[in-house]
Amino acid sequence: QKPIQLAHVSKQSIHHYCLREWLALVNFDVAQNIKLVTLPPPYMVEALSNHVIDGFCVGEPWNTQGELIGISQIVASSQDIMPKVADKVLAVTADWALQHPHTHRALTQAIQKAQQELKYLDDYTEVWQMLMDFNIIQFQCSNTVHVQKFHSIQNIIRHFVDDSPQPKIEDFKWLIQQMVKWD
């Protein structure tokens, strides 16, 4: 019998650590020894469909894509496993920040402004279309046909950042603990 093979997006990703923690809830040895592979998020559903992998841990919209086209079923979200941990971080070196203070400030302010605008946006039609235009969302999901999934993804976008976009020290501690535990 072929061993189970699961995929995540990167060995140092939140998805890798959430997958390991979820498996460890069942059996630590299984979590330690199961075959994990790395795949870019847009290829997860295709790899599952072609039986290259047996399951995956990835963020939206790819997990919903698999479910909508009938290839997979979401059994847990990373937020179910590790709530409120920083998922995405844009980091620059201290040297770069010192050499480019205006660019660094402008970049930070642009991200914060975009996060706030997304949080309070009433209509996500334009955002949704932009995500489709850039092939981030590669499947049809409408607010009239796939009501629950559409609003689930919209809610993830809206709450991508809480009150502060700053990573918290607890997030770094958790990530370092995971690196020591699983790498």
In which residue ranges do the predicted regions lie?
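Inter-helical turn/loop segments and adjacent helix faces that build the functional surface
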Residues: 29-34, 98-104
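A bilobed periplasmic-binding-protein/Venus flytrap-type ligand-binding module shared by bacterial periplasmic
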Residues: 85-103
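Ligand-binding "clamshell"
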Residues: 65-79
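Bilobed "Venus flytrap"/periplasmic-binding protein-like clamshell domains
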Residues: 2-68, 173
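A structural motif
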Residues: 83-85, 150-151
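Short coil/turn segments
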Residues: 9-14, 79-81, 94-97
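Secondary-structure end/capping motifs
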Residues: 101-183
